[in-house]
Curated annotation (Swiss-Prot):
Biological-process GO terms, alphabetical: translation
Entry keyword set: Ribonucleoprotein, Ribosomal protein, RNA-binding, rRNA-binding
Protein name: Large ribosomal subunit protein uL15
SUPFAM superfamilies: Ribosomal proteins L15p and L18e
Segments of skewed composition (Basic and acidic residues): 1-13
PROSITE patterns per the UniProt record, alphabetical: RIBOSOMAL_L15
Superkingdom of origin organism: Bacteria
Oligomer and partners: Part of the 50S ribosomal subunit.
Function: Binds to the 23S rRNA.
Compositionally biased tracts (Gly residues): 21-31, 42-51
Organism: Bacillus cereus (strain G9842)
Renumbered residue ranges of the record's region Disordered: 1-51
Amino acid sequence: MKLHELKPAEGSRKVRNRVGRGIGSGNGKTAGKGHKGQNARSGGGVRLGFEGGQTPLFRRLPKRGFTNINRKEFTIVNLSTLNRFEDGTEVTPELLLETGVISKLNDGVKILASGAVEKKLTVKAHKFSSSAKEAIEAAGGSVEVI
């Protein structure tokens, strides 16, 4: 391979199609818009979701549920991620934030029992699943609900 033999990858360089520039281009005169009608006009076209007057899908489907304004969203931390801390560490939401285990606190931290914990840790969080609580205590650690 020599410098003058280099070619761009097949299909990576596409020439822009200039419409309305003469009959010989194949896209002259009507510029690919056909004859008359809403879509041939400048600024023409139908709004999003319009189905030609037929009742649109978003109106045919029923409404469902509601948004609970009191919903609490907990940041989830699994037991397997707690193994990165040294034995005897007090694991708090602030520590999890500064070590980059979680990116934001939301409404608190919930510890779930995915994986296993091998270290003796004092874990402080807003919520624990019952199996996570048992696993931490079985490993010799302690659990504290904030």
